[in-house]
């Protein structure tokens, strides 16, 4: 279970004490590398955290590479203990103007929020994000969130002894305790994650129900070729369904054409076609109305790699997981119109 904390306003989050800790903005590429590196340092010995792919982090956080900066602005901050000296925390402050306009809110988001077990560090980081947002007319601090809903979201509050995946946030148990101690925040939303054991043989009741729905409503399972998804436009159609399906969900922001092109190029192009399945409506010219996208679980390979780099041996470890028996389901959507048909 993951929480979504939200501030009750943008007053001071934390009253600063006399301390050697300083919050500094990231203004250079070297600073951004330090910002990214802190996560790997903090979770180096964790059995449950999964290191993120470093190039993916760089592309997401770089203004010249992430299409979300067409409608977002952001500032990254580092907490440094100058008595050591050492980086002891980080936070990203983000304003998604498109989402704010869509939901009629004045929110500054915080994400990439990691810190040592020191309330002064976490409090000062959140205060820096709140102050940055307040200077830009924002009235509320909410997170952890990314630039868009395709980024990692939420703060883990249960399941700390379960292995994570590369697609979601993992954090130490002390994180939510810090949020509780900072009384300005309250829970805004919950996300649930499920682990499903797939039987070797499909249960007869399940198979019979699927066959009944398929024949009664003229729905059909559809597999794709890579050419159909990438060059043929079906990949874009998948994300158009995402926009349609999620438009009324919590703080969802419609994906732009540039974002969709980027996701098709980055993820769909690399996907295993056996793990992408669609459902089409035979009564509507075989229109795509639902789909699921999974990837081979990279958890074991990334944990062995630890530093998020693919070179020199990371590629080999990732290639081995293509034969694994665990998958991570990343996208599972159904258009609103056929949901009542099962």
Write out the residue ranges for each language-model feature.
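Generic start-of-chain signal for non-secretory N-termini
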Residues: 16-33, 37-45
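Single conserved hydrophobic/aromatic residue that forms the stacking wall/gate
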Residues: 1-17, 333-342
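A conserved beta-strand-loop-helix scaffold within acyl/acetyltransferase catalytic domains
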Residues: 39-77, 93-101, 237-283, 288-329
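Flexible glycine/acidic-rich beta-alpha junction loops that bind and position SAM and/or redox cofactors
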Residues: 147-155, 197, 297-303
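Acyl-donor binding region in acyl/amide transferases
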Residues: 100-184, 309-339
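A structural signal for short, well-ordered beta-strand segments and their strand-loop junctions
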Residues: 139-146, 187-195, 278
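Glycine-rich, N-terminal phosphate-binding loop and its surrounding beta-alpha-beta segment
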Residues: 71-82, 87-100, 113, 122, ...
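Acyltransferase donor/substrate-recognition loop-hinge adjacent to the catalytic core
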Residues: 19-21, 169-250
């Amino acid at each position: 279970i993951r929480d979504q904390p939200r501030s009750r306003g943008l007053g001071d989050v934390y009253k600063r004490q006399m301390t050697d800790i300083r919050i500094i903005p990231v203004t250079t590429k070297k600073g951004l590398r330090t910002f990214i590196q802190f996560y790997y340092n903090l979770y180096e010995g964790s059995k449950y955290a999964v290191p993120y792919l470093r190039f993916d982090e760089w592309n997401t956080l770089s203004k010249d590479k992430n299409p979300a900066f067409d409608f977002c602005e952001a500032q990254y901050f580092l907490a440094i203990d100058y008595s050591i000296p050492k980086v002891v925390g980080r936070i990203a402050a983000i304003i998604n103007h498109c989402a704010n306009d869509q939901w009629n809110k004045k929110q500054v988001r915080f994400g990439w929020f990691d810190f040592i077990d020191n309330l002064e560090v976490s409090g000062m980081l959140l205060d820096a994000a709140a102050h940055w947002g307040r200077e830009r007319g924002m009235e509320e601090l909410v997170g952890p969130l990314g630039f868009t809903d395709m980024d990692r979201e939420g703060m883990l509050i249960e399941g700390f002894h379960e292995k994570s995946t590369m697609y979601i946030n993992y954090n130490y148990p002390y994180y939510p305790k810090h949020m509780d101690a900072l009384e300005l925040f309250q829970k805004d939303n919950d996300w649930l994650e499920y682990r499903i054991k797939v039987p070797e043989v499909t249960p007869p009741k399940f198979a019979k129900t699927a066959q009944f729905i398929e024949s009664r409503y003229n729905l059909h399972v559809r597999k794709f070729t890579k050419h159909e998804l990438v060059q043929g436009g079906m990949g874009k159609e998948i994300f158009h369904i995402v926009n349609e399906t999620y438009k009324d969900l919590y703080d969802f922001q419609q994906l732009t054409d540039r974002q969709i092109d980027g996701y098709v190029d980055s993820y769909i192009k690399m996907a295993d076609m056996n793990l992408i399945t669609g459902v089409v409506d035979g009564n509507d010219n075989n229109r795509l109305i639902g789909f699921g996208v999974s990837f081979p679980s990279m958890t074991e390979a990334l944990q062995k790699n630890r530093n998020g780099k693919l070179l020199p041996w990371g590629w080999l470890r990732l290639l081995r997981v293509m034969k694994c028996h665990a998958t991570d389901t990343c996208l599972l959507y159904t258009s609103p119109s056929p949901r009542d048909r099962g």
